[in-house]
Design a protein with these regions (language model features):
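TPR alpha-solenoid repeat register
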Residues: 136, 177, 211, 244-245, ...
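Residue-level recognition of tetratricopeptide repeat
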Residues: 142, 146-149, 183, 217, ...
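N-terminal leader/linker segments that initiate helical-solenoid repeat arrays
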Residues: 3-5, 13, 26-170, 175-176, ...
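Residue-level detector of the short coil/turn that links helix A to helix B
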Residues: 155, 189, 223, 256, ...
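Canonical tetratricopeptide repeat
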Residues: 139, 180-181, 214, 247-248, ...
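Short coil turns that delineate tetratricopeptide repeat
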Residues: 131, 172, 206, 239-240, ...
Length: 503
């Protein structure tokens, strides 16, 4: 089977307000080597966003009322957007979910457990009283994107687009709305557009944290990893802090440098003080540990995340995956059932379906089929609302749907962007359609950066065996199972069978 990767929640990013976040003194920079430390760009450029207005008169509100509204808005918008691949994909390139996706967003340092529905209601009330507040419209657009993520409802994207356009009509080119456009583009998997919007902000505000982070995300999702690494260095020099540190870590993980990734995340967690920051960074550490097969550490980190915010979905899903890999399948099923009840996204739906299949009890096959059907329904809804869902289609359909559709989608996604994830998806779609010779180069490309991913190694091993490369195939399958022996309820079992048959 083609197991989905544990979602990498990359895009826990800065506030929609665009204000500077001062890192904790204990957080430091991203743990860079000394030669990089010597090249710090500590000078903070002038902030040019509308948040710099201090007289409160620009939109007709008195200073006290303006400040109160901003504080209330920040509290309500206390969840971060992910990039589209991150938020909705069956696997992430930038992965930490991704997403995301994937994209400019709200501050993880705000109070945990904030409700996007409440934020939308409050903003709508505010905008009825202040219809010319371009900041308010931009924030509403970002909140609709966040609402789509947390609800698994792409139908919010047209509403987000309308709100952002309203903001830009009132104040052409304002940073917050352009950052919102980057978030929306990433959520719809338009990473070229997201990069363009981020660059637009950075041209006149090079210290805009949301745009710096969006730029890294977009470059990662486009497979431009060397540029993403340079963008991470630039962001770390200009705006060191948790949103940048997590991206810096992921860029290193993609290169196979897990040690640096872990060190940077641990430093970020040491400096985290708010519930949102703690939940976010601990989840990143949990996902990194899970990917390396260290389930005990993964569960410890997910527990730490949930102690900070017991509603944080990526931690709940990650804990369920680690439980499944540790043999706690009843707890894993219960946990994933709760996750999909709140956000029925492809990653969690496929994971739950495969757990049902692996359990093999009465009615479990039908339960699994329902999860896979829901994936297809979500993909149809996503496409109807402007989301490029080809990667989701390729990954889900290759094992649990129309194999021909999986290959068509994988080819289409590969034509748009060459990443380790799109290479893996194309390789596996080619394999299940009987095109193993063509699949081989893509399977090897998926592992060429050094990224340590058991699913990729499993796919590579199966393709190598199918093309007569028995020694290499056995080595790849062995590496997959040594790295993460519980990487998938179905895939891990099939890897063991294939390895045994190849002896």
């Amino acid at each position: 089977m083609a197991p989905p990767d544990a979602p990498r929640v990359l895009s826990r990013t800065p506030k929609a307000t665009g204000t500077a976040r001062t890192p904790s003194p204990t957080a430091g920079r991203a743990g860079l080597p000394d030669h990089h430390q010597a090249n710090q760009e500590r000078a903070m450029g002038p902030r040019t966003s509308s948040d710099e207005q201090t007289d409160g008169t620009a939109d007709g509100r008195a200073p006290g009322r303006r400040t109160a509204w901003r504080v209330a808005s920040a509290a309500l918008l206390a969840v971060a957007l992910t990039g589209g691949a991150v938020a909705f994909g069956a696997a992430r390139d930038g992965g930490r979910v991704a997403p995301v996706t994937a994209s400019a967003a709200m501050d993880p340092g705000a109070p945990a457990g904030a409700d996007p529905d409440a934020a939308v209601a409050a903003l709508q009330t505010h905008l009825k009283a202040q219809p010319k507040d371009h900041d308010g419209w931009a924030t509403l657009g970002l909140t609709y994107v966040e609402q789509a993520r947390t609800k698994g409802d792409p139908a919010r994207y047209p509403q987000a687009q309308a709100a952002l356009r309203r903001s830009l009509a009132l104040a052409p080119g304002n940073d917050r709305a352009v950052a919102g456009q980057a978030a929306l583009a990433a959520a719809r998997h338009d990473f070229t557009g997201a990069l363009s919007h981020a660059d637009r902000v950075l041209r006149h505000n090079p210290y805009a944290e949301d745009a710096l982070c969006s730029r890294i995300d977009a470059l990662v999702e486009l497979g431009r990893y060397a540029e993403a690494a340079r963008a991470a260095d630039t962001a770390d020099a200009r705006k060191p802090g948790i949103p940048v540190f997590t991206r810096y870590a992921y860029v290193h993980e993609l290169r196979g440098d897990v040690t640096t990734a872990r060190r940077v995340l641990q430093r970020a967690l040491t400096g985290a003080t708010s519930p949102g920051d703690i939940a976010y960074v601990a989840t990143q550490l949990g996902q990194l540990a899970w990917n390396q097969g260290d389930y005990k550490t993964a569960l410890t980190q997910y527990a730490r995340a949930l102690a900070a915010d017991d509603t944080y979905l990526p931690a709940l899903e990650g804990r369920a995956r680690a439980q499944a890999a540790s043999g706690q399948r009843a707890a894993a099923v219960k946990g994933l059932e709760a996750v999909v009840a709140r956000a029925p996204l492809p990653t969690s739906l496929v994971a739950l379906g495969e757990l049902y299949e692996a359990r093999g009890g009465a009615g479990d096959r039908e339960k699994a089929r329902r999860q896979y059907t829901l994936v297809q329904a979500w993909i149809a809804l996503a496409r109807a609302n402007g989301v490029d869902a080809d990667l989701d289609t390729a990954l889900a359909a290759a094992d649990h749907g129309d194999k021909g559709a999986a290959l068509r989608a994988a080819r289409a996604e590969w034509a748009r962007r060459h990443t380790v994830h799109t290479a893996d998806a194309l390789a596996w779609a080619l394999h299940v359609n009987g095109h193993d010779t063509e699949a081989l180069a893509h399977a090897r490309e998926a592992t060429a950066t050094g990224y340590r991913n058991a699913s990729f190694l499993y796919h590579r091993g199966v393709v190598e065996l199918a093309t007569g490369h028995a020694k290499e195939g056995r080595a790849s399958l062995t590496a997959a199972l040594q790295l993460n022996p519980g990487f998938s309820p179905l895939g891990a079992a099939e890897a063991r069978k294939a390895l045994e048959a190849a002896k």
